[in-house]
Amino acid sequence: MSITYMNMFMAFTISLLGLLMYRSHMMSSLLCLEGMMLSLFVMMTMAILNTHLTLASMIPIILLVFAACEAALGLSLLVMVSTTYGMDYVQNLNLLQC
């Protein structure tokens, strides 16, 4: 395993740990999710380029499309929650009450 793969795997792991540990605010959770998606994109792109899979070259772009949709939905949810409740604490939200 090369040093670049190890760095990207470490970035994914740190983002996952950040998502699990610092989940009090919705904005920090969204930033950790974006870090995970970015590291997955880089790892997938490097793997496809190293193995010369030309048919799978669209997969990282599709992943970026899903990441952009996830970011847009997350930010719209953040705006809705912060205007409705006046805070972005994830712990105080209960979606079953809506």
Curated annotation (Swiss-Prot):
Main location class: mitochondrion
UniProt keyword NAD present: yes
Pfam family, one: Oxidored_q2
Keywords: Electron transport, Membrane, Mitochondrion, Mitochondrion inner membrane, NAD, Respiratory chain, Translocase, Transmembrane, Transmembrane helix, Transport, Ubiquinone
Gene of this entry: MT-ND4L
Gene Ontology annotations for the cellular component aspect, listed alphabetically: mitochondrial inner membrane; respiratory chain complex I
Reaction catalysis annotation: a ubiquinone + NADH + 5 H(+)(in) = a ubiquinol + NAD(+) + 4 H(+)(out)
Function: Core subunit of the mitochondrial membrane respiratory chain NADH dehydrogenase (Complex I) which catalyzes electron transfer from NADH through the respiratory chain, using ubiquinone as an electron acceptor. Part of the enzyme membrane arm which is embedded in the lipid bilayer and involved in proton translocation.
Protein's UniProt name: NADH-ubiquinone oxidoreductase chain 4L
Subcellular location(s) of the protein: Mitochondrion inner membrane
